[in-house]
Amino acid sequence: MSAELIAVYKDEQIIDLESAKVLGLSDGIKALNGTEPIYFDDSPLALEVIRHSCAHLLAQSLKALYPDAKFFVGPVVEEGFYYDFKTASKISEEDLPKIEAKMKEFAKLKLAITKETLTREQALERFKGDELKHAVMSKISGDAFGVYQQGEFEDLCKGPHLPNTRFLNHFKLTKLAGAYLGGDENNEMLIRIYGIAFATKEGLKDYLFQIEEAKKRDHRKLGVELGLFSFDDEIGAGLPLWLPKGARLRKRIEDLLSQALLLRGYEPVKGPEILKSDVWKISGHYDNYKENMYFTTIDEQEYGIKPMNCVGHIKVYQSALHSYRDLPLRFYEYGVVHRHEKSGVLHGLLRVREFTQDDAHIFCSFEQIQSEVSAILDFTHKIMQAFDFSYEMELSTRPAKSIGDDEVWEKATSALKEALKEHRIDYKIDEGGGAFYGPKIDIKITDALKRKWQCGTIQVDMNLPERFKLAFTNERNHAEQPVMIHRAILGSFERFIAILSEHFGGNFPFFVAPTQIALIPINEEHHVFALKLKEVLKKRDIFVEVLDKNDSLNKKVRLAEKQKIPMILVLGNEEVETEILSIRDREKQAQYKMPLKEFLNMVESKMQEVSF
């Protein structure tokens, strides 16, 4: 079965076998010019087809178990697939095995999956009385609607799908959640069931192991256990509270970045949190991003709370006249921004409404784009290396709708390619995926569980300099428009720390650990020595805690281990008298003794091991 053809890939689109029949291509589908065959296996394109069909298998089973069920959408997503639906019946996660069993029943029936195409009028009539399907159709333009059938079940869908349910043998329903209709909290709440599917038993087994590991590493769970951050309903959804340990972790990263940025010629700047709406109209945010912004009125003047830092940095640039000798100008800011995210998509620190970007904007001449991007790529590599992340780059090129002439776009895109080539970075190309105002490079990191995360971006902008009439005096004493490069490597501190927490499972490396050393005095008479040692370490910029509660030694050691503290020092008579310390080293997975002076030299050295 693994060699069976299930679809083809052509013009960045998957065409399943049923769609090929509708298009009259079924006889020559393999011979179509420019097609890539998709076989039944665990490749990304095949999994997209498999998981889409498994979503329909889920809906078919739900309809059989709960006849009043109505269905909204059931897409393939990064973590598998889901289906949003509603029913008068109460459904909990305890019902998932029953639903899964029904899915296996239908799969074993080897039902053919067929497709027909209806007009809008026919589709509205076919799904008469189904307000959820009518809601789906209202968001689709055109007059052609695909309907897929398997057995007595049918669903409005554009595909792609497998030719038969017999392919669906290795799947698992993973969780149940609530989801607002269309992600809008003003709409009714639907039930959402998530699932995963693979072509092979091994693929499913490996994934389920990864899921269990991911649950242990969930940053929301670790945030509570390690006292890093919290959320409070009285404050509001998507607005994190940084607790002392989390703030220490974050500040350490900020400080390391700041040191590196200053050495790399960046200047710190700071813009206001709210700006008049007039300036957002000039930038285009008011017309194109308004629904994601928060607004307030002061003295009858409308202000917008900034969703991005770029306008403030533009105003810094405009605060003085510039010549070519001043360029490049590199401004950075840990800028707090606010974006109106729908409550249904909020997720711990990964998706919040207030966050801080490691933002920078570079104003340079066109000829300086390559060298500036090259420097950013070098900076990115050092940061990713320090945090033990592998990463990949994706270059997005000119979309169909864009500003600027072909020559300008070609030069900008070529500059990005040459910078990537200079650093011998393999990269993917997203043809037409750039912003309308310039090409970009996306930075995607891979964590310890082999999950990919979108973090940083390097974006060439030829739009905002034009909108704000930015200029510098060139060598010929003429006014010339600079290029603006938007640059964020981490993306946001919130998102990066969430990913970092899950990458290390809370076992942060020594140089950023929120508590780096735990001092455990065995008895009260050892407490004074512990406090003195704490002060010595604090002067070396080490985060230290003294665990001096009236608990047993074993309990205090377990507490330090549970808090994932890299080094634990147990202080008793011998340590106090000889100043030879007993060290439990998490990173080395060893216990050893070391004279105090040598230990201090070691921790100082560990703090200096990492620089960006």
Swiss-Prot record:
One biological-process term from Gene Ontology?
threonyl-tRNA aminoacylation
The cofactor binding remark recorded in the entry reads: Binds 1 zinc ion per subunit.
Is-annotated flag, keyword Signal? no
Q: Could you cite one Gene Ontology molecular function of this protein?
A: metal ion binding
Where Zn(2+) binds, per the record, is at C310, H361, H486
Q: Which NCBIfam families match?
A: thrS (TIGR00418)
What is the official name of this protein in its record? Threonine--tRNA ligase
From which source organism is this entry?
Answer: Helicobacter pylori (strain P12)
